[in-house]
């Protein structure tokens, strides 16, 4: 089974201090075949201020140095996690036009600007009502993002749940999630199973079933690791879940094109 971790962060993300070489070494030690670094580029800051560009030269230089160091034993790819790209499609398209880029995750990390624009990490969730209000806003933004051309795979479509402690069910959102996934499928894009460093695997089963019903085939798996110790966490379990949901492949990417690996 070809094992890849397609959601990882390095010192070029504001919430990580790990050199890419350390993340790559951790991938080797975890027995992975392929690692994609997907550092953050969010078009809103954590507090909701707009951003219009990304500093590519340090990212390309770090990637090229690590790729040379790990030229045998590990395939290393250059990706990007582009957050809130739907808010500025022109800027998003410029950012993802980098020729060295292999892969783009499209994510929603923030509330909509109308709701304040802050990262869902900072939103208070005192009760279930607050959780559902946040989810309403989140899936509305995700629906807009899904229709844009600035990503290859939708990242962690259940993202806000990781911060919510009150009881929450996604069943009331299945129609919205199905519509989001159908939009991605119709545009030749895919979905990520994000293990949240091994903490969320089983939660993806109903989402995978919705994706399958939409005709989805492109799936990537990512740990969302921000430190070497998180690399590869939950990847094999996620692949087993994917196979159990009747999918035949997981994907990696090369210059924005999916490569299918049989499960």
Task: Indicate where each model-derived feature is located.
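Active-site gating/metal-coordination segments in enzymes
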Residues: 12, 68-116, 120-127
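Active-site core of metal-dependent hydrolases
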Residues: 188-198, 219-228, 235, 249, ...
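Domain-core and long-helix interface of multi-subunit machines
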Residues: 14, 107-216
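Short amphipathic alpha-helices and their capping/turn segments at secondary-structure boundaries
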Residues: 20-33, 87-102, 134-150, 208-209
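Structural recognition of alpha->loop->beta junctions
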Residues: 97-103, 148-149, 207-223, 236-251
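An N-terminally biased module of ancient metal coordination in phosphate/nucleic-acid-related enzymes
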Residues: 1-86, 95-96, 160-174, 179-180, ...
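Hydrophobic residues within beta-strands of alpha/beta enzymes
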Residues: 35-37, 104, 154, 191, ...
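C-terminal regulatory/interaction regions
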Residues: 245-248, 257-263
């Amino acid at each position: 089974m070809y094992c890849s971790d397609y959601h990882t962060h390095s010192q070029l993300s504001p919430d990580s201090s790990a050199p890419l070489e350390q993340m790559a070494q951790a991938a080797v030690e975890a027995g992975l075949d392929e690692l994609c670094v997907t550092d953050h580029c969010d078009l809103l800051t954590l507090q909701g201020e707009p951003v219009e560009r990304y500093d590519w030269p340090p990212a390309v230089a770090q990637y090229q140095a690590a790729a040379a160091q790990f030229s045998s034993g590990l395939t290393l790819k250059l990706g990007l996690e582009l957050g809130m790209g739907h808010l500025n499609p022109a800027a998003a398209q410029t950012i993802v036009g980098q020729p060295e880029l292999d892969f783009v995750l499209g994510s929603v990390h923030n509330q909509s600007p109308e709701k304040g624009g802050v990262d869902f990490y900072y939103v208070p969730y005192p009760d279930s009502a607050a959780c559902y209000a946040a989810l309403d806003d989140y899936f509305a933004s995700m629906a807009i993002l899904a229709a844009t051309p600035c990503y290859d795979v939708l990242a962690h479509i259940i993202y806000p749940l990781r911060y919510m402690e009150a009881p929450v069910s996604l069943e009331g959102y299945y129609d919205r999630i199905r519509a989001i996934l159908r939009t991605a499928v119709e545009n030749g894009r895919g979905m990520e199973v994000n293990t949240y460093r091994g903490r969320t695997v089983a939660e993806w089963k109903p989402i995978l079933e919705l994706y399958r019903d939409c005709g989805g085939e492109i799936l990537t798996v990512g740990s969302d690791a921000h430190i070497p110790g998180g690399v590869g966490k939950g990847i094999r379990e996620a692949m087993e879940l994917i196979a159990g949901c009747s999918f035949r492949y997981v994907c990696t990417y090369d210059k924005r094109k999916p490569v299918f690996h049989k499960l």
